[in-house]
Amino acid sequence: MEYVYVTKENIEKEHICCAISNNSDVQVRSKKDWLSCRFEEGLVFIKSSVRGKCFIEYIPAKNAWIPIIGDTYMYIDCLWVAGSLKGHGFSSELLNMCIEDSKRKGMDGICILSSKKKMPYLADPKFLTYKGFRVSDEASNGIQLWYLSFNDFDLPKFKSCAKDCHIEESGFVLYYTSQCPFNAKYVPIIENLSKEMNIEFKAIHLDTKEKAQNAPTPITTYALFYNGEYVTNDVMNEKKFLKLVEKLK
């Protein structure tokens, strides 16, 4: 498999895997704008040359848009290989590229979000275990910080603000970033739907690194709360949201 490094110089002509439409699409534009500002902070985006979801995105943890402590670690934003491309070792190849790059840059290890059981948009814990990762911290909502250490130094951990996953607000409250392109499409859909149905809903866009690093949740790409309690990180479309509303009544 051949791989392509997406950079500030070629991002306008390269697709970004999870959103493959043209540059005028709101999801593509949102993600590309976000990426373009992250490259100077050390973000690396590597994708396969085939058209589809097969890529890894990582950044030094000190610049990651989540509330973690671990400045000498590299944080993996996303490692995604679509089902149609599984079974060929692409996940391992992409992970190894991240490991070797992190070592060259003097990092003490790499880390990524996962959970005891597979959750939407999080790394597969079985794959991480197979690759030698271990859990260094866990929040009250079950989201875990997994790490692979190159040296025996301090392990990465969640900031205290992200551990309890509780907020003092009623109704639905969504924290999200532009790291996930789907948010540019689906957050407005849920906002409009909630308004039409008189559902209490508030969306909080974490539009700076500082806001994301001090969020009340270990996952910031998409974290939905209801009456103060964490509910899900699964990106809601109209059907999913209505089903969730009915369930929580």
Q: PLM features: residue spans?
A:
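Short amphipathic alpha-helix that is part of the acyltransferase structural core
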Residues: 1-51, 160-162, 182, 189-193
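Conserved beta-strand in the GNAT
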Residues: 51-62, 75, 80
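Conserved acetyl-CoA binding element of GNAT-fold acetyltransferases
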Residues: 68-83, 173
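Conserved acetyl-CoA-binding loop-helix of GNAT-fold acetyltransferases
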Residues: 81, 87-102
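Conserved GNAT acetyl-CoA-binding A-motif
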Residues: 102-117
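Conserved catalytic-core motifs of GNAT/GCN5-like acyltransferases
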Residues: 113, 129-146, 231
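C-terminal "cap" of GNAT-fold acetyltransferases
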Residues: 140-164
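Non-catalytic, surface beta->alpha helical segment in thiol-disulfide oxidoreductase systems
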Residues: 227-249
